[in-house]
Amino acid sequence: MAERGGDGGEGERFNPGELRMAQQQALRFRGPAPPPNAVMRGPPPLMRPPPPFGMMRGPPPPPRPPFGRPPFDPNMPPMPPPGGIPPPMGPPHLQRPPFMPPPMGAMPPPPGMMFPPGMPPGTAPGAPALPPTEEIWVENKTPDGKVYYYNARTRESAWTKPDGVKVIQQSELTPMLAAQAQVQAQAQAQAQAQAQAQAQAQAQAQAQAQAQAQAQAQAQAQAQAQAQAQAQAQAQAQAQAQAQAQAQAQAQVQAQAVGAPTPTTSSPAPAVSTSTPTSTPSSTTATTTTATSVAQTVSTPTTQDQTPSSAVSVATPTVSVSAPAPTATPVQTVPQPHPQTLPPAVPHSVPQPAAAIPAFPPVMVPPFRVPLPGMPIPLPGVAMMQIVSCPYVKTVATTKTGVLPGMAPPIVPMIHPQVAIAASPATLAGATAVSEWTEYKTADGKTYYYNNRTLESTWEKPQELKEKEKLDEKIKEPIKEASEEPLPMETEEEDPKEEPVKEIKEEPKEEEMTEEEKAAQKAKPVATTPIPGTPWCVVWTGDERVFFYNPTTRLSMWDRPDDLIGRADVDKIIQEPPHKKGLEDMKKLRHPAPTMLSIQKWQFSMSAIKEEQELMEEMNEDEPIKAKKRKRDDNKDIDSEKEAAMEAEIKAARERAIVPLEARMKQFKDMLLERGVSAFSTWEKELHKIVFDPRYLLLNPKERKQVFDQYVKTRAEEERREKKNKIMQAKEDFKKMMEEAKFNPRATFSEFAAKHAKDSRFKAIEKMKDREALFNEFVAAARKKEKEDSKTRGEKIKSDFFELLSNHHLDSQSRWSKVKDKVESDPRYKAVDSSSMREDLFKQYIEKIAKNLDSEKEKELERQARIEASLREREREVQKARSEQTKEIDREREQHKREEAIQNFKALLSDMVRSSDVSWSDTRRTLRKDHRWESGSLLEREEKEKLFNEHIEALTKKKREHFRQLLDETSAITLTSTWKEVKKIIKEDPRCIKFSSSDRKKQREFEEYIRDKYITAKADFRTLLKETKFITYRSKKLIQESDQHLKDVEKILQNDKRYLVLDCVPEERRKLIVAYVDDLDRRGPPPPPTASEPTRRSTK
């Protein structure tokens, strides 16, 4: 095999064995040797994705000559793809994660074994299939009559009709599939007939070959005496070829042993045989060249005596002569230790017959299988499968979750666990679920870990495995393994007694499951089968009921849909449930003898039961007889309660049929409210409050749960609101109690609590911490209020005293001793406590008066300063406005003078310059002599020259207009007239003389005039054609049929002057008409008058 490089740093190269094989082929073939096939570089070994289940390699093909088609053998099984070729890169969800080795030995298959809905596998042989090259959509209707479309192959659905594909009705699909099935059956019959014919032809060919072999043997017997010398050389060549073939066989056997795991089945030792086919026509010498083939043959045993074997056969070229010798002589047989492995890699392409597409195993999704929403891909029945990829059969059972080992568990469990996987004692003791991590080793022995669910690989041991190892170390069970061989995986029904101790303790919870929950558990779907040719599927539930499901419209029906009525295949599908068939297969495959796993489970369960019995005996030593009797009585009570509950449920079911659902739901909600069912609890915890109420049976189990969920949603908010209001009301009552107590703000909480501990309002606050917080808050508010009241009272006394002093009109020179005598009888004076405070307030009042006087003076000075500043600012603004106004007047005056100078200079030019042929330099000398020249002194030299040029251009334009007016008035001028002809007519006219003295300039102006007139005439003629309604898009066809239509058009146009102007150029006029007609024909019919986009016209 070619060595695979890393990231592309090394080129592709062949090993010596491949080069030697290519050289041998070049020597043995007469024509040019086939080139060695370039080995395609695949991904690195650890990055290579696992092959899909349908591409698993099987037994290698039988030996045959290279590059030649083998004879047909009807007993030969279908050939798999040639070995050595890496599987194709699959989609991302089928690719192996980094550092994950390919599946070998007993490793679990990768998750890619289950095809996703987006990539349906091929159909089984013989099943009617749609045309592979044609995309077909089927039109169907929903129960309410709405039309939708779905792809018959990919199951994709849409409300709108797809474009560019074939669309058929639902009623047309079934006949088409039936016709295809008939065609396939005919093709299979023809293929079988051809196979029989080929087998007969092969038998005849073998008989002929035997006859030829006998004739050759006789000829060889006659010629062997003459070829003894050549026989010695032949023996030497055979010995060399044999040694070389043995070396190649050993190299390839070693490569196979390294690249594939060794199966556990035994096989006879392979052999290396050398056969020498000879062929000699008459008595002449002929050389027969054969190819050396090294192949591993695996024969399928047809009887009990036949066993698979592998052999390495080497054929060498020989030169045969006449001699009495057998046809084929076995030279040597060398036994080799050769394990049964996958077929070796083929370094060159070998044509092989196409392998038949096998039916998909039970794990894969058959055609038209679309999983139900929220349900995983269902495994049929017990979900067992046989992987027949080598000469041995391996039975793989599923885990408790209903999936194969190594596969990701389903998102929503759909199938009840019906099989048990062989587990270690540690798993039986502590683990309640299969671990997601698996341990693997690389080629160099390094350990890594792979997660079957997340497809993640890591070098470090996960925490889950570490905890599992710790649990294994704690558990020490005296269980010895009877054999070192791996235990086969069994399919056993689950037994609660075989579960670990932890699960045994949880059994009472399982016994508490009500009849409604058990019925709901049984009503879950367990299997599904699609109906060919329709979007419907048949679904079986755990209670043996059948309903129909449409994954396209997400519609489920208990009754059979209209398009499935009267179909025999649907009746057959319903009569043969796949899960029951899987149970029967499981019973057939199940081994009757007890295994090591069953013995271990029995020992563990017996030891656990024994421990529990000992514990119960120790606890109930005093009353063993009473306990047993009580247990019997309890069992009887439980049975009687169950019977009574079943009778009540049956009676309630009859009553439910009478009372409307809304009334029953309302009564059920009232019961929940009356019984005080908490909105923050679960259905199981609150069930004991309502289960004995007669209204409990008004609804079935499903409706009870739904109403309870609605009640919880609405009642939760109400309870929160009530709880909040209750807490707020308790706080308000507590505050009122503190206000009524009128305690000293300096009191402590302990004193307050001791005094009011028996008050109901005190007890309404549950936590002492909350009571203390409310008390501290109230005390802080009281203290703050007291402080604010004291401050306010002091401010009022002060303001009243100041008012008293202000009434006596005091000034800064007043004395307290004199003022005191005047105000001491006033109550506002007496309100101040001490005389020192009164004197201090008096001094504050005098200082305030003095400050007020000073502040008034300062305010007056500031007011005067502001007035003066505003006057100065106003004066500056007036001066600025005056200066701007003066400047504007000066600018206007200058502009007026400048305009006056321009007018004077233009008047000067009008009087002095009459000819347009003069220059500025000559005219300037003449203008200087005029007195008006000085009036234009304000103009610059460039401005005067610019005005002169404008004056000259005006004169030239005026003369040109007069000249063209002269040409227009000359009726003899046509579009084809020349200057020589026109010159004779207009040369005496003053306008022609004044235009220019240069005849060349006149001719140039005349030619420009004719050109402009010609362009204008053509434009006017096109406008005339558009205005002529007689010319339409049909005119071209009419003109092609007869020239009369064109003559009619010209006759109509002759009445217009725009047509007559072009009389001098009739050919050009005819071209314009034809071009317009072609344009109308190209545009086609005109759009209707209401069209909003006239540009969208149909073009031919």
Swiss-Prot record:
User: Which stretches does UniProt call biased (Pro residues)?
Assistant: 32-90
Q: Where is the WW domain?
A: 131-164, 431-464, 530-563
The protein's predominant localisation is nucleus
Does Transcription count among this protein's keywords? yes
Tell me which Gene3D superfamilies the record gives.
2.20.70.10, FF domain
Q: Which PROSITE patterns match?
A: FF, WW_DOMAIN_1, WW_DOMAIN_2
Relate the assembly described in the record: Binds RNA polymerase II, HD and SF1. Binds formin. Interacts (via the second WW domain) with TREX1 (via proline-rich region).
Its recorded name reads Transcription elongation regulator 1
Species assigned in the record: Mus musculus
Phylogenetic lineage:
Eukaryota, Metazoa, Chordata, Craniata, Vertebrata
